[in-house]
Amino acid sequence: MEELQGYLEEYRSRQQQFLYPLLFQEYIYVFAYDHGLNSSIFYEPQNSLGYDNKFSSVLVKRLIIRMYQKNYWIYSVNDIYQNIFVGHNNYFYFHFFSQILSEGFAVIVEIPFSLQLISSLEEKEIPKSHNLQSSHSIFPFLEDKLLHLNYLSDILIPYPAHMEILVQMLQSWIQDALSLHLLQFLLHEYYNWNSLIIPNKSIYVFSKDNKRLFCFLYNLYIYEYEFLLVFPCKQSSFLRLISSGVLLERIHFYVKIEHLGVCRIFCQKTLWIFKDPFIHYIRYQGKSILGSRGTHFLMKKWKYHLVHFWQYYFHFWSQPYRIDTKKLSNYSFYFLGYFSSVQMNSSMVRNQMLENSFLMDTLTKKLDTRIPIIPLIRSLSKAQFCTVSGYPISKPIWTDLADCDIINRFGRICRKLSHYHSGSSKKQSLYRMKYILRLSCARTLARKHKSSARSFLQRLSSGLLEEFFTEEEQVISLIFPKRTSFYLYGSYRERIWYLDIIRINDLVNSLLVTT
């Protein structure tokens, strides 16, 4: 990033902050290859063109040479439209070059945002904490904050209706008109190609072929969406100490906020419209949660605010059913693979004062997290480890592997699933998942050797069992070697949140998506 920052500073001085000339530099595509994180086009095999999944500098140089040609893209697109139903060679060839260009373009537009993030962290002196990157790091926050809230809104973030909205958002950040025209060209042509080749396809087709660029545009859209939510929260916390008498006129609301921010007229009056000092916001995988300690009427105001701002700011109709508001004490919400709810635990305490004794019923709140067994079985069934009803079956595609490789694969999947779902307060679902994977492993081995699954379970009972141990269970088995099975199948009930889960396993990810 430091080297890339040096290139950017050089081009800023020469080209007056133009990003477009960077597309003609080969090192940009090298950066796209190095930092692709398995989402770059250079990692994906192009069987239709005969290329492998290695980075090809020859293709990049050929692309740069063709971009220097005048009106190359216009002539290529016209040629594709004329011959689209005659042959697909020109289409796939040009489509491949467009994907490479989109990868390089994604790297370029990320540069200003990356530099701004680095400078912001340095100014605020925020230390880099890798533990906060874990998906489990949010659950201790929920255990601490969620118990004091009354209502919860489950929000389904809508997708932008038109790609031109994304370009308009980027225009406020990047002043390079040529880069914006190139982005419009890529989005427009991909939409036309997909409508010709694969009709009735949405923006999802574009995201499959251009993961990095679409991820950047989607994150930009999410940033604008969250700004509409964070702005009233910041203003409400600030305006609680500011006179709100002049804010009763809603016509020039935001202009008056700016003037009030300078005047700082302290008063006991409060802004009643958005006042909510106990509001919390969490976003995950296209969804978000808005928790509040206020009343149901206040949550309706937030819903009204979000729906109308989506309509007027993003220019598309947003259905009110995308925001579901429930009372937290009577509501179980799905969050990152867990069904979470706030439970009231009753405990009897005996108090004695002098000669009199009496019992007191004490109620305490506790965040309960459980694994939904039906989506878990559905995910295992989709991966062909069991049937839809949860009956374990063999994995025929793995029968060509060695026995140790088969056992290691099943054990690795089981440990990763157990590692991610270790925060469940009820372990029955985990035990059933381990049973399905263990029996599926035995039946896969039996199918390979044309034997019975019972014989493999008897022959490899101890070794096969150890492969499905999780980390915490391995520690317990070392401390209590004679009581391993007892701890494995019923005694170990503590919730554990790990701070090293940076990337989610594919099977876990499919579980999160299917639910």
Curated annotation (Swiss-Prot):
Subcellular localization, as worded in the UniProt entry: Plastid, Chloroplast
**UniProt GO molecular function:** RNA binding
Q: Which GO terms describe its cellular component?
A: chloroplast
Arranged from A to Z, the UniProt key words for this protein are:
Chloroplast, mRNA processing, Plastid, RNA-binding, tRNA processing
Q: Which GO terms describe its biological process?
A: mRNA processing; RNA splicing; tRNA processing
Q: Give each disulfide bond as a residue pair.
A: none
Q: Where is the signal peptide?
A: none
Q: Which family does it belong to?
A: Belongs to the intron maturase 2 family. MatK subfamily.
Q: What does this protein do?
A: Usually encoded in the trnK tRNA gene intron. Probably assists in splicing its own and other chloroplast group II introns.
> Which protein, by its recorded name, is this?
Maturase K
Q: Which gene encodes it?
A: matK
